[in-house]
Amino acid sequence: MSKLFISCALPYANGPCHLGHLRSTYIPADIYARYNRMTGVDTLMVCSTDEHGTPIAVRAEQEKKNPKDITDIYHEIIGNDLKSCNISLDSFRRTTDEIHYKMAQDFFLDLYNKGYIYEKVIDQLYCDECKRSLPDRYVEGTCPYCESEGARGDQCEVCGRHLNPTDLVEPHCLICDSTPHIEQSKQYYFKLHEFEQPLKEWINSNEHLPKNVKNFAKEWLNDGLKDWIMTRDMNWGIPVPLNDAEGKVLYVWAEAFEGYQSSAASWANKHDLDWKEYWDDKTVHFIGKDIIYHHTLFWPSMLMGRGWNLPYSVVGGGYLSLEGRKMSTSKGWVIWVEDFLKKFDSDLLRYYMVINAPLNKDTDFSWDDFQRRVNNELTDNLGNFIHRTFTFTNKFFDGKIPEMGSYTDEDKEFEEKIKALPDVVANYIDNFQFREGLQGIMSLTKEANKYFNDKKPWKGVKEDIESAKTCINLSNQLVHVLSIVLTPYIPISVQKIRKVLNMPTEHVDGFMKFEERTPLVKWDEAKEFLPAGYEINSAKPLFSKIPDEIIKEEKDKLYSLEEENKENEDDNMSDLISIDEFGKVKLVVGQIKEAQKIDGSENLLKLQVDLGKEVRQVVAGIAKRYEVDELIDKKVIVVANLQPAKLFGVESNGMLLATDSMELLTTEGNVGEYIK
């Protein structure tokens, strides 16, 4: 039997799961795992909470807690979130587990002994007040490239530039707010540059890497790879296993990857199995697109250094925005999984997160669209077809599937589509095209409703019983197929269908129990039709419509939480300006004529904007929100009387108005027209 190792990106243990986490990583991974189990693949799906790193350490110091106290809380919360969404993990562990410490240190030592890790003396910031070195997140200051304040020691959120703490202008310690100074420190570096050519060969030759993942990795490779720091001067983390490395821990990205393997090892040891057999056969990583870089360059190079098999694929899911705006936990613009599931079934979330957009694309969660899809697609389309099939069978055929009657071209075409569906869906899932597989299912159920309406079996039982028999037989056959091919997508709802069909039902809620790893219903059973005379049970509607008032409640709650956070940020509105001050701002309608990315920045675009009497060069931080091509000829609102500023070394002569989520404010006004 072939084996499969599936890993889910490690959730960081400083907060609960929100809907974006489920959409990009955990739901797709679960679909893939459930499908593979049903096809007979011995599947192991693992995850751990990521519990080290500076954000947790900084928070613990600010709250005067032990970091472990924080991670204890969120490990449990995150685990409950994933269980509630029926993510069928075989193992959910922690990077604070003893076995993880040992495996991560062994990995480091192996690379060190092979000569892939070396010592290097670097400049670091040191706080005299705290009497210690300051790793990245312990420092904030002004970005040297775009001059934005509040840039972290590892990255500027405004221009997207990756930073070192020593790059910051006017840095200050986040713990005591004092100004640090530069001191030299010995750290350990991984020879990433030595793996540049092998990485290129792996990425170019790997046909299983999704296009978005491959393209992202190639961009970084084209810029050349620099050696990568593996250690930090901290007291929270996994100690560097060398005699002369006291006070140093492994950088979180030097050990978090190992969380996949240590989680698997914990599970395997418990059940007297070998986790590496799964790894060596086929490994697939499910992650968010923000860590594609780490999983296609850092991690594979470490595996090459160790002499271990590389992943079969890395699947990077896109971002989820909320009501057209970027999610922000600090501003309350977020939906937590726990809150969502207080009102709605997990299958509704799973369905909506998959059907909304291809996994490799960013998408948006809208309460109105969620209601529309549940009511129109799940209730009126899928649920309606299944319920009317069951109801009609029970009412007119004594709860037994009738034998086939007359057989028209329409019947034959419908039957062929039913028989083809399992392979169609399987092909999509095999290629990580989960939305396309679900679309194929929903498209056929829509056709099935039309087929049912066109055949009019309610008239046929009186006027053409042979036609009615065929219609109801084929409709039941499709429902039987749906009870299997929908299992990876909406596992709880499927059990209700199977119960009516007298099929084996399974415990699909929560994490996977070892004794239940082998599914009771196999994928290929969808290719077998039920015999005439097969008896079904009585049925209830599978889904219910979501009323308008429920959606209104959720929207009101979302906006009230955001407003509450705004009030907490600034209770007294101390930054009010007068009408005279505002009158000095000149807003002009402009039209974007050219747009190009700025080398080295993930967020900034250089734009040429026609203002009527002149064309202005404007630098805007919208690269993560817009593709270059979609900006051309877009009419925008420009603040035209700002002093010139250099962002990332490029002069900007104006500013575009945009929302917090970087959505540009547009207008139908004439180019060059002033806005008052």
From Swiss-Prot:
Q: Which domain of life is it from?
A: Archaea
Q: Where in the cell is it found?
A: Cytoplasm
Q: Name one GO cellular component term.
A: aminoacyl-tRNA synthetase multienzyme complex
Report any Pfam family annotated for this entry: tRNA_bind
Which is one GO molecular function term here?
A: ATP binding
Q: Which reaction does it catalyse?
A: tRNA(Met) + L-methionine + ATP = L-methionyl-tRNA(Met) + AMP + diphosphate
Q: What class of enzyme is it?
A: ligase
Name the InterPro entries for this protein: Anticodon_Met, Met-tRNA-synth_bsu_C, Met-tRNA_ligase_1, Met-tRNA_synth, Methionyl/Leucyl_tRNA_Synth, MetRS_core, MetRS_Zn, NA-bd_OB-fold
The answer on whether this UniProt entry bears the keyword tRNA-binding reads yes
Q: What does the annotation say about its assembly with partners?
A: Homodimer.
Which family, according to UniProt?
Belongs to the class-I aminoacyl-tRNA synthetase family. MetG type 1 subfamily.
**Name used for this protein in its record:** Methionine--tRNA ligase
Question: By which gene is this protein encoded?
Answer: metG
